[in-house]
Structure formats: structure tokens, C-alpha cells
């Protein structure tokens, strides 16, 4: 297994797909990196030689990825919460941020359902 940016890249996959295992690198950025390193996109990781891996490491090093990117995202979310804007309030409350309805859905953000017991009706 090739190790790039602290991530084990699977050997049996094509280069474009394998690079997406790194947090912060999607398909288009992976294609861009391989073009910059002059490595064939359809070539499997197991067929890469040390020279190609070195070029890919250099190209990947130019981007903000993995832990650095995660930290950046966390800091920007914390900033939104600190300034008290709408998005920050929604983050704090654990609700969807982008205008989705919350009456029926949004279970991913809210978490599991919390059952609420029925009130007993008052007798006359």
C-alpha cells in the first residue's frame, strides 16, 4: 500500500479513485493532481513506481488536506457559533442549516427519536 499524506492508499484501485481516500481530495482534484504529476489516471496504484509516488506526494502537499482541513472547518464552524449568526445558532442547536423543513424529517441532524409520553386527559 502506498502511503500519501498519512493515509494508506488501496493498491487494487485506479489512481483517481484511490486518491479520494484522502480527506479533502475529490474526483476532480484527484484528476488535477495526477495530470500535474504526469501519471496516467487509469493506472492502478500497484503499478505506480517510486518516482511517480514522489511526484504525487509533492502535488498533494500543495493542498490543505486531512487534519489541517478538519481543523480549519471546525474553526470556521466555531466562529459562526461565536458570532451568533443564524447558521451558528442552528449548529449549536443541532438542526439543519440550509432551510430544510424540520417538522417531519431531518433525523440525521436531530439524532434518534425521543419518545414523549402522552398526557392523561382530565376527568370530569
UniProtKB/Swiss-Prot annotation:
One of its GO terms (cellular component) is small ribosomal subunit. NCBIfam families: uS13_bact (TIGR03631). Gene3D superfamilies: 1.10.8.50, 30s ribosomal protein s13, domain 2. Signal peptide: none annotated. Located at the top of the head of the 30S subunit, it contacts several helices of the 16S rRNA. In the 70S ribosome it contacts the 23S rRNA (bridge B1a) and protein L5 of the 50S subunit (bridge B1b), connecting the 2 subunits; these bridges are implicated in subunit movement. Contacts the tRNAs in the A and P-sites. Pfam families: Ribosomal_S13 (PF00416). Part of the 30S ribosomal subunit. Forms a loose heterodimer with protein S19. Forms two bridges to the 50S subunit in the 70S ribosome. The keyword rRNA-binding applies. GO terms for biological process: translation. SUPFAM superfamilies: S13-like H2TH domain. One of its GO terms (molecular function) is structural constituent of ribosome. This is Small ribosomal subunit protein uS13. Keywords: Ribonucleoprotein, Ribosomal protein, RNA-binding, rRNA-binding, tRNA-binding. Residues 100-124 have a biased composition (Basic residues). The gene is rpsM. It comes from the Bacteria. Transmembrane segments: none annotated. Belongs to the universal ribosomal protein uS13 family. Residues 94-124 are annotated as: Disordered. HAMAP family: Ribosomal_uS13.
